[in-house]
């Protein structure tokens, strides 16, 4: 902080306000004055994580001369005997649910007061250890330079050239986004608060939290398996620790700061684990991983899963968003089957391969869409293919979710009438009109994030444009992918067509701009699209380089005329993971028709 006048300066510490700032967010806050340059404390909140305690330590570069604070809470159940002290001024402890504190300094003109903040999930001692270990000095420029170097080391893992500067900005903004979560969740000594609320030590791995798995299994974690496999393996180990500490003995659904918040559906940890395993990123306990996946997928209490196990579908009259749940469970079950097959567990492979076919049970051939079923086995009569809320779906409608069988696209195509009929159906998704009433009450979605009835801001659609490839219409994949890249991403404050969802929207952009995408994580295949870059160079952790080159690249030349891999013509529109991590060169020959 720089103060422009020769006067008394004030720094306010606000422990009562937050991002959403709703009442009763704070359970308790506490502040302790250690000396005239060091304060410690914690803030315990409920909400997204219903029991979250952040411990902190703050040091000032200049001593404060006095301080004070106030608890603005209207009610306090029990005040104790603290009332005998004047706690508003120069009292070394402050506590309450609505606490603000101030610190006064004597400054001269243009004086700077620097602050360093350390946080911990374990203790104020841990916060102070983190602070002193990570920034032991007061050299601001050094911190800035070191921070820039760290970011550059991440950003340069993929180096690209583009036609337009804004495409370059979009790409590296996307890489930046993919580095923001999951987040490191342990102190420098390895300690962290676990899901059981006890203190654990991360030995030989970095512990992570903030797992928005319903979103990030699709592209973020597959991206990590290419450019950050060690980090992704540590994330999987963190998920396995979550499983062991969980009262329910489940892998994370949407976990944050030693809490499971149960947001969204599916059990997509299994997708992240299977994708890593199938791609050779196995620096974790594979036997524990398979155990955790199987046990999670057998939890009958979870989101209609008992009905799904018994009936082969989730009944809408027993558990809402039933079609979405059925389809996502089927995909997750396929992921478990792939792991079991690789580990020679034939019994588990057969069980979950059979379960992975359950998507068929909610397809109504009479209307050509996935449709909610009731517990008596009949389809629900009230049915609107465009409706989302209370209609059997979550963050999507029947149009979107009827295309969600990522693990068996050819079977889906045959079920929906064959390749020509499917291609026509899929094309109409992008050309039809979705009336405003169908998304008026949907958070984070506006007309700007929609192309026809394709809603890019909702993740269930992220693989959809690539399905044209499986219907022998790769040109339609190429046309639509390039259109989405250009329309749904802008270098501005409103530049995304929806919530970035912990890096998933950005990971989609990175893959698609490079020219390929993981339609079914848990497979070793990527589906080819239409690259946006002129060239790209992926620096792989194994020391090799995978290069991408486009010939005749332009705004109009969105169609792929030919592809070569290491000088040989690529047959079809599938790229293998081994092709990438072995290093080499992928060349796209582009054209306007």
Residue spans of the language-model regions?
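Beta-sandwich/jelly-roll carbohydrate-recognition scaffolds of carbohydrate-active enzymes
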Residues: 2-208, 241, 498
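A conserved hydrophobic secondary-structure block that centers on an alpha-helix together
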Residues: 6-10, 20, 161, 206-210, ...
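Beta-rich accessory regions
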Residues: 7-8, 12, 34-35, 109-112, ...
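Secretory-pathway/luminal and periplasmic proteins that interact with or process carbohydrate-rich
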Residues: 20-23, 180-186, 244-250, 301-302, ...
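Carboxylate/His-rich catalytic cores and anion/metal-binding grooves
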Residues: 161-188, 226-239, 261-295, 360
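Aromatic/His-enriched, Gly/Pro-containing loop or helix-boundary segments
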Residues: 201-208, 249-267
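Active-site core of glycosidic bond-cleaving carbohydrate-active enzymes
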Residues: 203-228, 266, 270, 280-532, ...
């Amino acid at each position: 902080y720089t103060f422009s006048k020769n006067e008394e300066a004030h720094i306010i510490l606000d422990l009562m306000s937050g991002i959403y700032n709703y009442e009763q967010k704070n359970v308790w806050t506490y502040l302790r004055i250690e000396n005239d340059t060091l304060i410690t404390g914690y803030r315990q909140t409920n909400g997204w994580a219903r029991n979250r305690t952040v411990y902190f330590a703050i040091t000032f570069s200049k001593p404060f001369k006095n301080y004070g604070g106030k608890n603005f809470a209207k009610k306090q159940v029990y005040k104790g005997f603290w009332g005998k002290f004047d706690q508003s001024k120069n009292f070394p402890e402050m506590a309450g649910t609505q606490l603000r504190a101030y610190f006064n300094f004597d400054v001269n003109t243009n004086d700077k007061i620097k602050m360093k903040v350390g946080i911990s999930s374990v203790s104020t001692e841990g916060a102070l250890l983190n602070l002193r270990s990570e920034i032991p000095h007061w050299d601001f420029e050094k911190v800035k330079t070191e921070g820039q170097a760290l970011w550059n080391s991440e950003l340069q893992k993929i180096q690209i050239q583009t036609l337009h500067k804004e495409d370059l900005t979009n790409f590296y903004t996307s890489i930046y986004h993919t580095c923001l979560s999951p987040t490191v969740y342990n102190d420098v000594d390895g300690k962290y608060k676990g899901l059981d609320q006890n203190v654990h030590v991360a030995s030989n791995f970095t512990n992570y939290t903030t797992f928005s798995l319903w979103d990030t299994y699709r592209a973020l974690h597959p991206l990590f398996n290419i450019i950050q496999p060690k980090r992704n393996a540590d994330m999987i180990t963190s998920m396995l620790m979550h499983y062991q500490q969980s009262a329910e003995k489940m892998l994370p659904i949407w976990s944050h700061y030693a809490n499971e918040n149960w947001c969204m559906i599916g059990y997509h940890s299994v997708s992240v684990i299977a994708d890593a395993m199938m791609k050779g990123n196995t620096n974790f306990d594979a036997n524990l991983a398979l155990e955790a996946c199987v046990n999670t997928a057998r939890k009958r209490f979870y989101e209609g899963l008992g009905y799904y196990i018994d009936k082969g579908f989730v009944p809408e009259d027993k558990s809402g968003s039933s079609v979405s749940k059925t389809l996502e469970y089927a995909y997750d079950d396929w992921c478990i089957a792939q792991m079991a097959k690789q580990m020679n567990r034939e019994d588990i492979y057969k069980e979950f391969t059979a379960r992975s076919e359950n998507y068929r049970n909610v397809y109504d051939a009479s209307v050509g869409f996935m449709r909610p079923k009731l517990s008596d086995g009949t389809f629900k009569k009230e049915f609107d293919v465009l409706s989302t809320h209370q209609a059997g779906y979550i963050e999507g409608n029947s149009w979107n979710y009827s295309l969600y069988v990522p693990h068996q696209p050819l079977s889906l195509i045959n079920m929906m009438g064959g390749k020509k009929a499917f291609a026509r159906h899929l094309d109409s998704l992008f050309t039809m009109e979705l009336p405003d009433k169908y998304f008026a009450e949907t958070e984070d979605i506006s007309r700007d994030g929609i192309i026809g009835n394709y809603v890019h801001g909702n993740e269930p659609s992220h693989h959809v444009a690539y399905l044209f490839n499986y219907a022998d219409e790769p040109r339609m994949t190429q046309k639509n992918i390039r259109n989405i890249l250009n329309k749904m991403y802008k270098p501005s404050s409103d530049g995304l067509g929806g919530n970035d969802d912990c890096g998933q929207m950005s990971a989609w952009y990175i893959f698609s701009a490079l020219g390929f995408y993981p339609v079914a994580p848990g497979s070793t295949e990527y589906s080819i699209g239409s690259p946006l870059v002129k060239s790209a160079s992926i620096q792989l952790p194994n020391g090799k380089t995978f290069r991408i080159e486009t010939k005749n690249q332009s705004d109009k030349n969105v169609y792929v005329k030919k592809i070569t891999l290491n000088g040989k013509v690529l047959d079809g529109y599938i790229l293998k993971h081994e092709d990438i991590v072995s290093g080499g060169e992928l060349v796209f020959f582009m054209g306007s028709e």
